[in-house]
């Protein structure tokens, strides 16, 4: 089967992060052979809606995903906090959120609005997309907000295992990336670095050999046809390289709630999230992981390497 070009592009990280590796690979530091294929299967966007939470909790309970991340400003945070406290060993990070993308379902910051005005659109919500966020957000206000999100999570009994960035806003400018890296190090948390062939040298210069960086990211994009969804992920498994790769999935049930939340937004919408859920919970997906000798790991494992 021909390799999907999207997969090829995303695996650029395998070579990009090599320069930051230590004398031992992450696999070796975790006790595996150097040529091991380690995989984090990661569910984004917990707390956006009950439908997303239910699908993600089910996938976590079934070990179909190994990790997930939480959007602290979102309305269903209390539900996620209850799950986190009931399942303290689950691998839950924070999906640091500086945008609010849905048409009729919006949220604002955790920090007081008067302390982060550059984060707000004219309606008083977080910016609806990455481009206006990139244009308007001041780095010092971004830092104030992401620290507020972390402290809010901690206050609710959530002990995050890692950090990443919703819609990649914190990768959009070097000063925002600097804030992201600074805060992750301050809280002693590993962070996802979404780097690619066009990553500015200023961003790369902010990374250190002490940072625990994964080697690759795979995520479905709008170019993947609905009838090719399963093949996209199965091909990705077959093409895994040695190192640590993360599959980023967006889970949910294609029900009335999620259809309303994601109205007029088919990309990452209800049907998209149902497809992701169907594939990663399927017996075929699990068997292919086993057949290709893929070792499932968590961000919690990587976090131990920082201590």
How should each PLM-predicted stretch be described?
Residues 139-212, 217, 222-229, 238, ...:
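Catalytic domains of cell-wall/extracellular-matrix polysaccharide-remodeling enzymes
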Residues 8-17:
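Bacterial N-terminal signal peptides
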Residues 191-194, 265-307:
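C-terminal domain-boundary segment and adjacent tail
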Residues 3-4, 19-40:
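N-terminal pre-catalytic segment of deacetylase/amide-hydrolase enzymes
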Residues 29-31, 56-62, 79-91, 108-121, ...:
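Acidic (Asp/Glu)-rich catalytic clusters
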Residues 51-74:
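A short alpha/beta connector and helix-capping loop motif
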Residues 107-133, 261-269:
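Active-site gating loops and adjacent loop-to-helix segments of metal-dependent hydrolytic enzymes
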Residues 38-40, 65-69, 89-95, 160-164, ...:
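Structural preference for beta-strand elements that scaffold enzyme active sites
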């Amino acid at each position: 089967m021909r390799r999907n070009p999207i997969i090829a592009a995303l695996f650029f990280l395998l070579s990009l992060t090599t320069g930051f590796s230590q004398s031992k690979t992450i696999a070796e530091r975790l006790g595996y052979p150097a040529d091991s294929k380690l995989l984090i299967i990661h569910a984004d966007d917990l707390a956006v809606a009950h439908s997303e939470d239910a699908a993600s909790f089910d996938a976590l309970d079934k070990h179909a995903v190994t990790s997930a991340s939480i959007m602290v400003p979102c309305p269903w945070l209390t539900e996620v906090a209850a799950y986190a406290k009931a399942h303290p060993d689950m691998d839950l990070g924070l999906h640091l959120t500086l945008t609010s993308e849905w048409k009729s379902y919006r949220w604002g910051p955790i920090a007081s609005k008067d302390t982060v005005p550059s984060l707000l659109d004219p309606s008083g919500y977080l910016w609806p997309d990455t481009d206006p966020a990139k244009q308007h957000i001041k780095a010092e206000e971004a830092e104030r907000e992401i620290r507020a999100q972390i402290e809010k999570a901690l206050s609710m009994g959530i002990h995050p295992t890692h950090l990443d960035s919703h819609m990649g806003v914190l990768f959009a400018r070097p000063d925002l990336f600097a804030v992201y890296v600074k805060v992750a190090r301050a809280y002693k948390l590993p962070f996802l670095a979404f780097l690619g062939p066009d990553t500015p040298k200023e961003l790369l210069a902010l990374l250190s050999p002490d940072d625990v960086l994964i080697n690759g990211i795979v995520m479905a994009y709008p170019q993947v046809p609905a009838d090719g969804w399963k093949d996209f992920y199965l091909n990705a498994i077959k093409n895994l390289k040695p190192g640590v790769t993360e599959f980023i999935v967006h889970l949910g049930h294609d029900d009335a709630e999620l259809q309303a939340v994601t109205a007029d937004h088919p990309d990452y919408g209800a049907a998209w999230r149902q497809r992701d859920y169907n594939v990663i919970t399927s017996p075929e997906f699990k068997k292919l992981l086993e057949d290709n000798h893929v070792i499932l790991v968590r961000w919690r494992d990587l976090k131990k390497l920082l201590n």
